[in-house]
Structures are given as structure tokens and as C-alpha cells.
Amino acid sequence: MPQRPEAARAGPVAGPDAASKPAPGPALTLRGAGRAYGPVRALRPLTLEIRRGERVALLGPSGAGKSTLLRLLDTSLAPSEGTVEVLGQPVADTDARRLRALRARIGTVHQQLLLVPQATAMQNVVAGRLGRTSLARTLAALVSRREAARVRAVLDEVGIGDKIFERVDRLSGGEQQRVAIARTLYQDPELILADEPLASVDPARAADIAALLARAFAGRTLVVSTHRIEPLLAHVDRVVALREGALAFDKPAAALTLRDLGELYEARRGAADPARAPAARPPSDPVVAPGGTLRIGASSTPGEHLLPSIVRAFARAYPGTRVSLSLSDSAAVTAAVRDGALDLGFVGARDDDPALAYEDVARDEIVLVAAPVLELPPEPITLEVAARLPRVDREPGSGTRAVVEQHLANMGAALDPAAVVLEAGALVALKAAVVSGMGVAFVSRRAVEDDLRGGHVRTVRVEGLSIPRHVFAVLRRSPVPSAAARAFLEVARAEVPP
């Protein structure tokens, strides 16, 4: 059971601020909209309407379908069935040009803030207006007085106007969150979608963020997904709850009771959902990991884009086996497997070490991507030009970086080290820098599939360049891998698309 609102008693709990007066007319309309990934239904057919100016909390435990629903609402994901209308436009009938214009009217606030750490608060805020400016332009100090005045105004509105010229990596976590909210506010959106902004923060900070969201986006349509309703209750008009991909309840915030929350979060009894059946059957003998825990390591691409679904499938198939998952670069993961600190690793590059065995798990390709706002030479560009473009790189131990450097060197077009404008220690930071227009980047296609579909980045065509990429499982040859490691690898093969 989650923590329950202290304000709640046996009857209804407190409602929204009196200042919130939703305007008539729908901002969002779903009619039987659902989403499936193969045989698994992430979101069952849902019919829902949210009025313009309404503030809605989207509640539910992890895996309930909240993020999938938000992706339908921000148009980055199409429904498998039913229809979605956003700000009066049927998404399925909207062409690419109008879809870009529609997305410009939608602001998002993420749990991962997607800020560029080496840039100032002002540069991050201005670069947030995707399709209208770029971080390269702001870094060149080409921000007009009018833009600078407006940035200061939105930073004042979130309480950090005095930090306008401070680098983001020198700000506190709370101040960075305010920069992210100011960036969205600067876009002047009609609809704001916030995905778990209260996750991983202490109760006092969660209350501050909830109040700030309500104040900063007053009068606009606001949808906030969360599994913690307490900080939001005083600031929303309505609570929509999901459980196992289906609507659990939809009611005014003032009518929410402790019983509602208890039923939402209590353990499900009865038959299992066939749509969420295990990927593999448990064997007749229990799978035991050495030391009681199966230690898995992964580099960014498999760790962030493949392993989450594999770990869930493994937990369903082998509920008695504990799994720990750690993320690092390919070199560090490989070294940890070699040293026995990990039982199994998932990496993007091989090491010529006879003590290690590699097995091909998934195929991918490395592509060159850029923000739509970044001006480049006419395409397709030559290898020599690609090697000299302003570039955002991963850290030296990255498997992607190693593969790209070796591939281009073999083609006689070694990457120019002087072209590196930022070395990002995490994939999320690299994508944020590219989206803001700082430079191009070589990335796994799997890692940017959502960004490509959403129009946040585009691929850059390069003459004669094709870089195949593999995701490998790495194990030690001796001692023989445990039954748990082998079972995990079997689940991975069944779960990961080719």
C-alpha cells in the first residue's frame, strides 16, 4: 500500500484550489483508444474527455499504463485501436506539417529533466522552443533583448530569476526542476503533460513542485501522472486512475476517498491477466542465482531500451529469483563480468578477451541524428564533412562511440576530436543536447526511435555510410554460467524483437 493522504478521512478528501475554473470544451478526447505491443496490452480501450483549463491527476501504480496514455496524448504514439483528439484535432487525420504545429501547442515536463548541464538557465529555457531556435544560437549569444526579458520573466515566475546566467550543473536539484518548468512555460503551450514529476523526491519538495506546476500553468490544461496523489490533491480538479492498463475510476478530486486508494493499490486476487502471461514457463527445478541474486549489468542502449521488459518478463517467469540491474558503459560492464562482479552483461561492443563469451541478442544500426533546427550542408553529406560537424559524443567507454570511431577510421574518415562540443556521460544528456541544436550525434536507432517518431530529431544522410550494430550478451567462459544467467538469456531472446 502506498502512503495515504493525511488529509483524507473516512469520507471525501480535499479538492483543488478555488482559483482553478475549467473552461468549457474538450482539450483531449479519447474514444475507445488503446495500445498494444504485440500480444501485451499496455492500455485497454479507454473513453475519456478532459476539458480545456482542467487540471487532472493521472494516478496508478507502476505499470498501470500512465506513460502510455501520456504518449497518446502528446501524439508521439499512435493508438492500436480507437481515436484520439488533441486540442480539437483528430491525430490520425492530421498531416505531418499540421502535426508539428499541434505539438508546438503541447508542453511536457519529464521526470528526467533533459537539461543541458553545461548551458545556463537562460540557454536551456530558450532552447526549449523546439523548431523556433537552437542552443547553438543561444550559445553564440544571439538572444535578443526581448527574448532575454521574457526568459527572466518566466524564471521569476518559478522563483529563480536571479539564476538566469548560472550554469545548470551548478544549480540544486530543486532549482534544476524549476528551470525545466520554466522551459515549458516559455513555450507558451495550451496543454501541459507532466510525466511523474514527483517521483524520486522527498515529500516537502514534492509539495513544492505540485504547487509550482499549478501556479505556473494556471488557466491551461494540465495532466500530471503520478503514483503519489497526496501533494497534488489540493491542486487538481479531477483524478483519473488506471490499473493494469484499464480505467479504475474517474472522479472529482473532492470525492476521492481512502477506500478508492486502497482498492487501487491492493494486490490483485484471482486469475492472472492472459495478456500479461510470462514469456517463459518456470522449470521443474528452481532457478537459483549464486549468492541469491542474479547480477546483471548493461550499457545505456540495452539498459534503457531492452532490459526493462526483459527483467519484467523474467520476474513473471521466475518469481523466486532476485535480479539486480546496474547501468554503466560497455567497457565497465565487460570488465565487471570479467572480474566476476556481474553474472551477465549486455553491451554494444565486443572485447577480444578469450576468457569471455559473447552471444548475439539483438540487431540494430548506428545513425547520425540532428535536431530539425540545426542547419547542415545539403544532403547526402560526405564522410569527410560528417567527421567535422559539431558533435555530441558519449563517454570514452561507450560501445557506440567505439564502434563508430573504428568504422569511420577503417573508411579513411576518422572523426575530428576538435569537433566535439560536448561529451555526455548519459544517453539522456546526449539526446537533450542534440534536441536543443548543440550538434549532431551518432546513436543507436533503438535509442532514438521515439524521438524520431516524435519529430524531435531526424536522421542525417551520409554518403556510403552504414554502421550495423549488435547488442551482445557477455558471460565468463569459466566458471560455467549459472542456470539463472542462462534462464535470463533465454527470456531475453524470447522478449527482444529481432
Swiss-Prot record:
Segments forming a coiled coil: none
Disulphide bond pairs: none
Binding, ATP: 60-67
Alphabetical list of Pfam families matching this protein: ABC_tran, LysR_substrate
Region of interest (LysR substrate binding domain), residue spans: 270-498
Keyword Ribonucleoprotein: no
InterPro entries reported for this sequence: AAA+_ATPase (IPR003593), ABC_transporter-like_ATP-bd (IPR003439), ABC_transporter-like_CS (IPR017871), ABC_transpr_LolD-like (IPR015854), LysR_subst-bd (IPR005119), P-loop_NTPase (IPR027417)
Keyword terms of this UniProt record: ATP-binding, Cell inner membrane, Cell membrane, Membrane, Nucleotide-binding, Phosphonate transport, Translocase, Transport
Enzyme class: translocase
Major localisation: membrane
Record's keyword annotation contains Cell inner membrane: yes
Domain ABC transporter: 28-269
Location of the protein in the cell: Cell inner membrane
Segments for region (Disordered): 1-27
GO MF assignments: ABC-type phosphonate transporter activity; ATP binding; ATP hydrolysis activity
EC number(s) recorded for this UniProt protein: 7.3.2.2
Membrane topology, from the record: Peripheral membrane protein
GO cellular component: plasma membrane
Gene3D superfamilies given in the database record: 3.40.190.290, P-loop containing nucleotide triphosphate hydrolases (3.40.50.300)
Reaction(s) the record says it catalyses: phosphonate(out) + ATP + H2O = phosphonate(in) + ADP + phosphate + H(+)
Family: Belongs to the ABC transporter superfamily. Phosphonates importer (TC 3.A.1.9.1) family.
Subunit details: The complex is composed of two ATP-binding proteins (PhnC), two transmembrane proteins (PhnE) and a solute-binding protein (PhnD).
Role summary: Part of the ABC transporter complex PhnCDE involved in phosphonates import. Responsible for energy coupling to the transport system.
Name this protein carries in UniProt: Phosphonates import ATP-binding protein PhnC
